[in-house]
Amino acid sequence: MIGALARKLFGSSNDRRVKGYQSRVNAINALEPELAKLTDEQLKARTTEFKQQLADGKTLDDLLVPAFATVREASKRTLGQRHFDVQLIGGMVLHEGDIAEMKTGEGKTLVATLAVYLNALAGKGVHVVTVNDYLARRDAGWMSQIYGFLGLTTGVIVHGLDDAERKAAYACDITYGTNNEYGFDYLRDNMKYRLEEMVQRGHFFAIVDEVDSILIDEARTPLIISGPLDDRSDFYNTIDTFVPKLDKTDYEVDEKQRTVTLTEAGMEKIETLLRDAGQLKGESLYDVENVSVVHHINQALRAHTLFTRDKDYIVRDGEVVIIDEFTGRMMPGRRYSEGLHQALEAKEHQPVQPENQTLASITFQNYFRMYEKLAGMTGTAATEADELFDIYKLEVVEIPTNLPVARLDEDDEVYRTQQEKYAAILAEIERANSRLQPVLVGTASIEKSEVLAAYLKQHGYKQIDFGSERALDKLYAAARAGKPAKLFAVLNARFHEQEAYIVAEAGVPGAITIATNMAGRGTDIKLGGSLEMRIQQETAGITDEAEKAAKIEQIKADIARFREIVLKAEETVEIEPAKGSKPAKTVTKPGGLYIIGSERHESRRIDNQLRGRSGRQGDPGRSKFFLSLEDDLMRIFGSDRLDSMLTRLGLKEGEAIIHPWINKALEKAQQKVEARNFDIRKNLLKFDNVQNDQRKVIFDQRVELMQDESVVETITDMRHAFIDDLVSKHVPEHAYAEQWDVAGLKDELKRVLDLDLPVDAWAKEEGIADEELLKRIETHADERMAAKVAQWGPDVMRYVEKTILLQTLDHLWREHLIMLDHLRQVIGLRGYGQRDPLQEYKSEAFTLFEAMIAHLREAVTAQLMRVEIVPPEEQQQTLPPMQAHHADPNTGEDEMAFANVSLVPSSGAAPVPAEARNPKDPTTWGKVGRNEDCPCGSGKKYKHCHGRYA
């Protein structure tokens, strides 16, 4: 109560922060008349002036007012749009590195230009992050008009670009792209072998659009670049045949935790099936040698019990394609890891693709925390403000709307069964359609959207075929005639190619659009329809300019008329009075876009996003959720008690219960789920931070190695450290000579370093100590390496040293990632022994990391001590492109092997001597200096011709 009173008297902290920006808004407004007088060239020249002022010592904060005023003026001249005062405030929040929460239709894309331009003046590159390629292209194409007018360059990163195109896009002042592409480019860059092949140029400032979707909804799924392992499709198919043979008593499913475990009876049955199939090693399922079999049994169980076709994935063209649970979009190319995707393929009797090995991975949480400054925009972040601050140190600032929100949010209607709920939704759609009010129905899955579509078809509605040209002509004609068209559109993962078009036209009179969750997010729904979309669709084939202009005028008139129809599509409802009270009264519910939610999502934020599609820029609108006790949220979180209560109240079939208490109870259930999901994400981050710290060490070290002209000092240090470890192991400090393992040391030197040294004779010398032994071994090893440098030349050896070091580091890092994954899967069991799994994981991960570094020293030293360089037997005409080897960023590898150099042990073939050289036969060339003319006769230096990869 005291807090509420204080907020009423002094305003909330958010109100005070917003008011704090007003003085700068006034200063920007004061500059407007002055800038309006400038010519285009004078306005453009201000960019150069700002850059000079930065060079002279001014800060970006010092330039905020004049820079924002300049962007506003440029926007007026290029786009015909002027930033509102509240949009200026949004730009300031972004510049300060926080999250601007702005309602749908408030112009977030335009707001971003303010902070983007200001920060781009620093010359370090600004990244604007969107959720899909369409939005990246659209926003870059649209906003580059402002940036280009002011002399800044704009690039776009989308799927399918090669490295040269990516590098050019990142070199621009401003780069638009998707969160996936930025993350994968970072991972691929850290798999390259030369600095000039890297495409990104740092992480200075990023603005994340739909920040809640990217930093929260996708935080649990890491970006993974992987490569295929051996084909085990027969094994997966065999395991899959076992699951249908199990009864429900053989396993226990926990839907809340998304886990499934075998019971004692189930284990015995599986053991018998495995034994009969010849897949069981030893006596018991839980013998050590059967660990991977147990893992795959569990994955097959999960595939059959926890994953539903058309909800969690779809089957398309012989492939199992994941569906994003938050957006309902297909995610082609992305695959579940650790055998789960293969289990789904076996379940659906599709070709089982090879399992993948993780080559590199990072979570969005850790990728975006690398930026010096991070900001975000969204329409719904307030409910997750604590998490955004806790993990990313981002404060959420609610920006006031330019016009008050005029949407009516009605109480939920709760029915007993899903069938009753769908019948009520259908009746509501028919009432709205009869008065030409456009309806957007939100569903939680493809399966639910298609159930609704089937209901509509049964009642005489036809689905719009967006594969045909002018798909909406019948809808437009019916709207002009003032009649319902009885047509509907479905927007889900199956039809995401037409996503923007379907969403943009969801505001046409009589339109019925069924959309999974938040599909189409980022595209505004304008009442009456989208002018840009219709012009694009309806003038595509018109070449005559006069005819085109006339068509555009007709479309404009159409949309203006349609908008009026939608605004007038109000509903007058008669409310029956209670017994003994006054006569019935009527209530008018607004027109505009009508949002119908077919069930509540686990997160309040997703529900708010759906509501937020209506009521943009002060337009009227309404929203209502229809629920049933059979919905997932209701079923998992206590529908049994509610069902018995409704029975006692005498609720009849087809009747709904509507009360604010129900809304509050649901909100509490959602808060519990949100809190649980936050804890899961937070816990995952704690574990991922362990790997992230190690990743940073390895990636930073790789970049340093690539920057160095020569890694000879590093190689020498590694060799000496390995020899030191070897001597310490076999000749411990302060041990007596009789305790030395001289024979073991001699064998190890021969095995690893290929050095046959008289260690046994040295050990018998009077007064010899471990330090003297160490020094002699190091000297002999150094002499062996010096001889190789003398034989092959310093240029060749420097290249070989760097390549072997980087390749070995990459190989061991990948093996280390597998070890960490396995450790993470089993570490939770330590909790049963009263030990903290996180602390245990940290300790063991560090031990594994130290072991990897020791192994690196040994492996690199061993390879270099034995390496011989053999020129190729014949010239390679073509070479594989040095880029990631995967169709989609989720399953790719960026690995470079020797093209024209073979590394063989010294026991193999000897080097080819330099004889009389035949220009057409590279095998006769012998050793060629990198700066010599190429023996092929091209006239180029060897290093620029056949020696490029030697």
UniProtKB/Swiss-Prot annotation:
Subcellular location as annotated: Cell inner membrane; Cytoplasm
GO MF entries: ATP binding; metal ion binding; protein-exporting ATPase activity
Main location: membrane
Details of cofactor binding: May bind 1 zinc ion per subunit.
Region spans: Disordered: 873-892, 908-932
SUPFAM superfamilies per UniProt: Helical scaffold and wing domains of SecA, P-loop containing nucleoside triphosphate hydrolases, Pre-protein crosslinking domain of SecA
Residues involved in Zn(2+) binding: 934, 936, 945-946
EC primary class: translocase
Catalysed reactions listed for this entry: ATP + H2O + cellular proteinSide 1 = ADP + phosphate + cellular proteinSide 2
Keywords: ATP-binding, Cell inner membrane, Cell membrane, Cytoplasm, Membrane, Metal-binding, Nucleotide-binding, Protein transport, Translocase, Translocation, Transport, Zinc
Membrane topology label: Peripheral membrane protein
Cofactor(s) the record lists: Zn(2+)
Binding residue positions for ATP: 87, 105-109, 524
GO biological process per UniProt: intracellular protein transmembrane transport; protein import; protein targeting; protein transport by the Sec complex
One Pfam family hit: SecA_SW
Any single Gene Ontology cellular-component annotation: cell envelope Sec protein transport complex
EC number: 7.4.2.8
Family: Belongs to the SecA family.
Function: Part of the Sec protein translocase complex. Interacts with the SecYEG preprotein conducting channel. Has a central role in coupling the hydrolysis of ATP to the transfer of proteins into and across the cell membrane, serving both as a receptor for the preprotein-SecB complex and as an ATP-driven molecular motor driving the stepwise translocation of polypeptide chains across the membrane.
Subunit structure: Monomer and homodimer. Part of the essential Sec protein translocation apparatus which comprises SecA, SecYEG and auxiliary proteins SecDF-YajC and YidC.
This protein's name: Protein translocase subunit SecA
Record organism: Bradyrhizobium sp. (strain ORS 278)
